[in-house]
Structures are given as structure tokens and as C-alpha cells.
Swiss-Prot record:
Its cofactor is Mn(2+); Mg(2+); Ca(2+). NCBIfam families: cas3_core (TIGR01587), cas3_HD (TIGR01596). Residues 17-229 form the HD Cas3-type domain. CRISPR (clustered regularly interspaced short palindromic repeat), is an adaptive immune system that provides protection against mobile genetic elements (viruses, transposable elements and conjugative plasmids). CRISPR clusters contain sequences complementary to antecedent mobile elements and target invading nucleic acids. CRISPR clusters are transcribed and processed into CRISPR RNA (crRNA). Cas3 plus Cascade participate in CRISPR interference, the third stage of CRISPR immunity. It is an enzyme of class 3 (hydrolase). One of its GO terms (biological process) is defense response to virus. Residues 297-504 form the Helicase ATP-binding domain. It comes from Streptococcus thermophilus. ATP binds at A310, P311, M312, G313, I314, G315, K316, T317. InterPro entries: Cas3-like_dom (IPR054712), Cas3_C (IPR041372), CRISPR-assoc_Cas3_HD (IPR006483), CRISPR-assoc_Cas3_HD_sf (IPR038257), DEAD/DEAH_box_helicase_dom (IPR011545), DEAD_box_RNA_helicases (IPR050547), Helicase_ATP-bd (IPR014001), Helicase_C-like (IPR001650). The gene is cas3. Proteins of this family have an N-terminal nuclease domain and a C-terminal helicase/ATPase domain. In some CRISPR/Cas systems the domains are swapped, in others they are encoded separately. Mn(2+) or Mg(2+) or Ca(2+). ATPase and nuclease activities are dependent on divalent cations, for ATPase Mn(2+) is marginally preferred over Mg(2+) or Ca(2+). This is CRISPR-associated nuclease/helicase Cas3.
Amino acid sequence: MKHINDYFWAKKTEENSRLLWLPLTQHLEDTKNIAGLLWEHWLSEGQKVLIENSINVKSNIENQGKRLAQFLGAVHDIGKATPAFQTQKGYANSVDLDIQLLEKLERAGFSGISSLQLASPKKSHHSIAGQYLLSHYGVDEDIATIIGGHHGRPVDDLDGLNSQKSYPSNYYQDEKKDSLVYQKWKSNQEAFLNWALTETGFNSVSQLPKIKQPAQVILSGLLIMSDWIASNEHFFPLLSLDETDVKNKSQRIETGFKKWKKSNLWQPETFVDLVTLYQERFGFSPRNFQLILSQTIEKTTNPGIVILEAPMGIGKTEAALAVSEQLSSKKGCSGLFFGLPTQATSNGIFKRIEQWTENIKGNNSDHFSIQLVHGKAALNTDFIELLKGNTINMDDSENGSIFVNEWFSGRKTSALDDFVVGTVDQFLMVALKQKHLALRHLGFSKKVIVIDEVHAYDAYMSQYLLEAIRWMGAYGVPVIILSATLPAQQREKLIKSYMAGMGVKWRDIENIDQIKIDAYPLITYNDGPDIHQVKMFEKQEQKNIYIHRLPEEQLFDIVKEGLDNGGVVGIIVNTVRKSQELARNFSDIFGDDMVDLLHSNFIATERIRKEKDLLQEIGKKAIRPPKKIIIGTQVLEQSLDIDFDVLISDLAPMDLLIQRIGRLHRHKIKRPQKHEVARFYVLGTFEEFDFDEGTRLVYGDYLLARTQYFLPDKIRLPDDISPLVQKVYNSDLTITFPKPELHKKYLDAKIEHDDKIKNKETKAKSYRIANPVLKKSRVRTNSLIGWLKNLHPNDSEEKAYAQVRDIEDTVEVIALKKISDGYGLFIENKDISQNITDPIIAKKVAQNTLRLPMSLSKAYNIDQTINELERYNNSHLSQWQNSSWLKGSLGIIFDKNNEFILNGFKLLYDEKYGVTIERLDKNESV
């Protein structure tokens, strides 16, 4: 290929008047080499086995998986060997560089290229051109489509590919096949293909293997990753224009890869003694439940999905981490994803996962990289500390072994890191049609997946969850589901999706009618095509919770009674507005110091501080206040390890009520005598189903009615958890109300509930990827053509989160306060406006985000809200565009009264109560 190095370019730029370029062959060689090194040093054993087993061998060539990965790297930019690409003007260079590179081509015999004016060069993007050329030269669709999609999106259909025939000049400069220049382009393109084949051990196109679709996705992701690394000029520098070749090619690849590679591949130990495993990892011996689980998994041959249903506080997290090591060893995984419902729960577990990661390293000199992935990860102090240490000397193990690799910190690459903690959205997006989706599949297919706090997922989110699990089944990736309150039909759907991904037909599975049992605790798992359940455990200590239905007008009396002679009273309600109203009322009566409030409408830094304060007050081993009222929304039920002496809650679906009950008498501590019996009060139960409007909007009448119907006067934990959840969510269990009008109201609510589910499922399917193709059929081809058709229109991470959760659009701003003639943070009385371009100050400011109330982001007014904010920022905060931390953000400055007028509303921020909103024309709260 030496002769081709002289004239085709892959990259070009200009730095300090130096004209730089990278010959196409050098970039292809770099990418091929990176693909080979990633195969050897980054891919998990399980991924390699998947690819090798997906190959339909056409020859006796060894290591066909690795060779195919390298071939893709070697040929991926063949579409750049076309006039359409070579005549492109550079984005970061003078015209002089463009001219000189075209002159190289002229001297090489491509006469007229300097003056060529193509009619439609953009119709033949080099990725599509690459697929078209490979197909033209005999490469099968399954491999050629990977090349066509290496910029993040495969072609939607063959029509788009076939249309390339209409642009012969884009490929050959001339439309006449017998012209010299046409033949010269053709012979050079063939030379690139033949070089790629020879370099990777294939004698001809006919020797290239056929490969199944799931493995195509992994190879596609691997190619994109290889290309991105090889395109990084810090790793692989460009050459001066007068250079045509790299002097020391082996040194170039070795140096470049070492600059990128900072962590070692995790190779899990094989433990025979499970007690030792727990002691070394967590510092304690396993409980009966944990030991039985690990012993069960140890006996399996080909495990896949494991569902753990057990009460709160039994140690499911440690059980999952121990089992993830066992599954990694059995299935050849080399990483972990731990997903939780919210940013707060992800933050809460990050330190524990980091410590486990440190412990699995043991006394080795291994270095492991870990990521915290959600919208507010930069606020997590533990993650920030790791970020500060990410420039450690990797040869010096004294400097720490768990760190953050910056290359994996981008939103497209974070899923590729070995150990990732984040919100469950990250996993749900495996099923969302998004550009560069193959990268996310590449990252998740090398890990054990743990999804914590899986309850009765919304029907919309379930579409993405079940599809993502189906793809994990196709990849043979272990999935661990943790839940305290899982409806039986949800358990069945999870298992069914995974088995379908494996290619196992549901009707062929024995004893499937047993899957919906209500035993508790319960382990459900597969071993190859068989499903098993474990329900025999050591009898657990029972805790009695007494349930009282509480009329709203008696709330004050119960709270006062709970405080008399000492006690911590918790109140969990379903809306922010109600929590604020209650907090104000009780503060007026009992004093500000007696009442704490937590919900999602605080400035982000304030919410995190409030969560920490709460854990210090009523968390494990906390020094508890003699008396306290703590009011909050659903954030209090989500993994905060807190303990109330008495708990009051709005009515909610049964599984969520039980989650809330999990915060009542959670720890074994000495309590005031009158609180020795656990009492749980439920607000908002109505015989006529006249539920609170805010609660109805959140949960719907149907589940509220069924929960109210089956809610007993006493719950025995943990024995009653599963039976109660199954009763509410088992729609086959019919209930009848004596009053005909009430029964009709219930049936109407059921119809509305069922319609809502159907609509949500239909809506979710719009941007959800299709099932993996395990076998070619007349309906579905064995390739990636059309895989991302109807791509989600917005590529931002925030929009993707909203899409997989079906969240209404919200507007987030950075909240500041007017100080003197400038502005500052609410927590500091200091004007920082003149130093806003200081990176330290800008980063601190960027952390103070606030989600505006929904009244400002309705379909009819969200555009106006954003337009007003943009005008305000252009006028008052234009300096932010000069800061990498603040560029693109929207800020608001509350006045001296903590007020801000926006789109016909007055916002008021209070450090105790959060943000509230009033409509200006009616002067009433919204």
C-alpha cells in the first residue's frame, strides 16, 4: 500500500501555519491495529465467544472473529477513496492545504480532480459510499452494512443504497466506465479492499464469514470505538504534508494504545468458599438468603437472568455483587452495571460499589475505572474525588487503583467503561433508537447487569426494559433483577423476554404455570433453557405493622400525638405542592426547627445537602433528635436508609406503600415507649373513590381502588409483602363492590387504566428497536439495515432520558440570587458575577440547577418559556458563553425578595420550602 500513501488523505488540518494530514492507508492501519488490540485487551471473553459462535464459517481460518474485527477496521473508510470525499474542503485549514492535496492526486494520474465540480457530492457520504463499494465488490450485506453504519446509523433501507448508482461521478470522477480516470479510481478502491483482506488473513471476499445480527451490533460498536480511538490526534498524531509514511509503525500503535489504555481487564476469581467471598468483600459472613442464592448460582451451568425478591434491608445489594462475581466467572464478563431508579439512589450506592471494586482487586496491582452516570454526577463528592485523581501514574499502585478514565466520561462512551453506576435510564436506552446505539450495546454486552428496585414499572418504561433484557438474552449477558415488591406478571415478563432473546420458545419451557407463585423471599433464575425457583429459606423474624386509615382532618392530632414525649414523625405525600403546604402549616404550629422538608423542587446542591442532613438525623447509627416532623414526597421512599418512629402516607399503589413502610422502624434502636409498636397511617382513602386530584394524576383510580380494597389492618413483614402486591396487580383476581354505581365506577377506572397501558405501549414502540434477529426470515433480514429507522429526533441525553421514561418536557435553569449589583449563590452572600469565567467558580455555579414547576413547561407555553429565558440570558448572563461549564445553560437571578417573573408567572424560592409558583393574572398558587 506504500504507493497509495502518497495521495489519498483521511484527515487534514492546519496548526500554527503547519499543514498536516494523515494518509488514508495510515488511518486504516491504525484502526485495524486498534481493533485487534481491543479484541485482545478490552473485549470480554463472553463477547469474543458470542462473536465466534455467531460466525458461519466458510473456511478453516483460525480466529475468524478477531480477523473480521480487524478487517472492518482496515476497510471502514474505503468510501474516502472517492472523488466525493477527496474534493471536500477542510474545516480547520487554509485553502492552500486543500489545493496541495488535490495536486498530489493530479500528479498520481487523477487528471482534472483539482477542477472537478460534482453536482451532488453530499449524496455520497463516505460511510454510505463504503457500504456501496463493498457491496459492489462482492461483500455480503451483513458485513457491508456495518461499514455503512460506522458513523452511528446504518442505512434505513436498500433504496437509499441503490440510489448511489445515480451518482457515478461521486465514485469514479467520470461516468464513462472505459475512461482512464474511472478505471484508476476503481483499481485503487479494489486495492484498498484487497489490502484489507490480505492484512487480516482472508484470500478473497468469498472467505469472509457470515455473521448473525446480534454479533453484528457488537462488531459495529467495536468498529466505532476503534475508529474514535484511532482518530484521536493525541494518541495518533497527523503527519506533516511532506511526509508520506510513518517511520516506525509498531512504535506508533504501541504508544497510541498505551496513551488510551489506563485500566486492566477484570478477570473475576473463582470462589469455592462462599463464606470467604463475603468476608473478603463485605467484612461479614453471608446470611441464609445470601448463602442459598450463591450456592444456587454456583451449581448452574449456563445461567442468564436471576430475579431476587426479598424484603428491604436483607442485603440484596451485597447478594447481587457476590452473584455478579460468580456470573462473571461463569459467563466471561469483565464489568458491572448497577442501575437504580433515581439520581439520589445512584449517588447513595456509588461509594459501596467503589469499595467493592477496590476489594475485588485484592492485592493485585490492577487498575479499574468506574463511572457514575446521570445528569448530576458532577455533584457527587465521591465521584469528584475520583475525578481529581484521574491523572494518576498507572505504574505507581500507591496512588490508588480505582479511578475515572476521562475517555469514558463522554455521554456516548460512558457505558463502555468496565464499572458503571447510574440511573436505570442508561440501561433502558439500550432499546431506544439513537445514533451510535451500537456503542451502548458494546458496553453493556461485556458486563453483568444489575437493576435494583424494580417494582411495578410504568407500562411505557417496561417496553424499553423488556426489550433491553431481550437483547441481553441474545448476547448471553447475565441480568440480576432486585426487588422487594415485584408483581408476578412482571416477573413472568422479565423471564419471558430474556428467554426469547436466547431463542427459547415459551411453550417449550416446563412448569411455566408455577412462575407466578407468591412465595417470599423468592429466587427465580434460568439455567440454559430451564427455569427454576428457590423458595425455601430460614424463617425470618416477623414485624407487625398496624395500618390505620386516617381522615385528613385528624392529621394534626396524630402528628401532635406522635411528638408528645418524643418521636420522629414522617409524612410522605404524592405531590410537591401538598408537601410544601403541610410543611408551612406544621412550621407555623410547631416551629421552623421542628420541621424538615424534602422534595425534587430544590436547587440541586440544596437537595443533596438536605439528603445528607436527613441521613445524619435519622439514618443508621444517627444521633436522633428527640422530636422531629419530616415531610417529603416519593424521594423519601427511594433507597434513603432512614427510620421513622411513626409514618403517615398518602394512599399509593400497594408496592409503593410497602416501600414507604420499609422506612418505618427500619433499624433496631431504642424508641420512646409509645412508639414500640409500628404504626402506619394512610391518608386519602375514600369509599367512593373520590381520591385527591394530585394522587389520581400520578397513579390513576384503578390501582388506588384495588390497593384500598386489599389494604389490611395489619401487615406482617416480610410474609405479607408478595401476597398483597400480587392481589393488587393480578387483574385476573376480580373484585366486586356492593353498590352498583361504585362497581361501575371501578370498572370504568379499569377500562381507563387498560387503555392507558395500551396507549403507552404503542407510544413506546415508536422509538424502540426491534427484537434481535436470531434467524433470518422473509420478514426480517439478517443485517443492520433499518435497525435505527425512525431514529429518535433529538440526540441529547436529557431528551433520551425523557423518552425512555415518558416524562413530560421540563425546563431546568441555574438558580442565582441578586447580590449588590451582581449575583451569587443562595448558600453564599457573595457577588461572583465578575469572576464567572473562573473555571472553579463556573463549575460551582453549574451545580446549582433547579427544575422549574410544570406550569411553565406545558405543551402550550414551553416554547415561550424557553424564548423568554434565552432573551433574559442574552441580556443579563451573556458572559456565560465564554465558560465551558456554563455555555448553553439558562440561568435566572432571583431578586432581593427571592422572586423572578417568567412567562406570566411569579417564581418564589425559599431555602426551606423550595420553589413555588403563582399565576400573575389570577394571583393564585398553581
